[in-house]
Amino acid sequence: MFLSGCTAEEEQLIDEGGIEVPLATAFPNWSSTSHDSSEMNNSMFENESYVAYFSAPWCGHCESSLDAYDQVLPEGKMMIFSYDADEDYSDMNAWHNKTETNLNRTIDRPFMLNPPLAQAVGMNSLPFVLFVNPDGFVYHVQVGKFTDQDAITNLWQSTESAIVDEDGRWL
């Protein structure tokens, strides 16, 4: 049996200096029209946490993740954005209806087309989910299929209480 790790017998001093904490990043300003023609923008969420869920109508594995987030996040706290402006996928009402049919239940979340916002947040995989704290800073980014509802709940609760100091560092 071979165990990886420290195998040297001689004692070594390890620098235990501080770890640089990344600066908080503000979620970009945005505005979109939802699948039901409602106008939405970031100012509607001033002093409130929310989740920005980026996906595409053709992403099959994204539906199970969307289902998990939808099951646990409070009403009105998740926006679903598509980055794909291709004519075949730009109908948000069709995407909303297809998702409801596939999940066999009502999804009471706004579905919005916003490729520039996807680019602004650096979306590089699907799904791409950002948890935004009440001050408008991105607290957590979750990339790829993620269906652990307990973990999503914990991330949401942490996001709601996440605080940024005056230097832009997470406390």
What annotation goes with each model-predicted range?
Residues 1-17, 22, 171:
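Secretory targeting signatures
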Residues 130-171:
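Thiol-/selenol-based redox modules, centered on thioredoxin-like
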Residues 61-75, 93-97:
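Typically the conserved alpha-helix immediately C-terminal to a functionally engaged Cys/Sec
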Residues 96-135:
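Short, internal strand/loop/helix patches
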Residues 29, 41, 47, 88, ...:
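N-linked glycosylation sites
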Residues 23, 40-63, 79-81:
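Short active-site neighborhood of thiol/selenol oxidoreductases, capturing the structured segment around
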Residues 76-92, 104-115:
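Thiol-based oxidoreductase modules, predominantly thioredoxin-like and allied folds used
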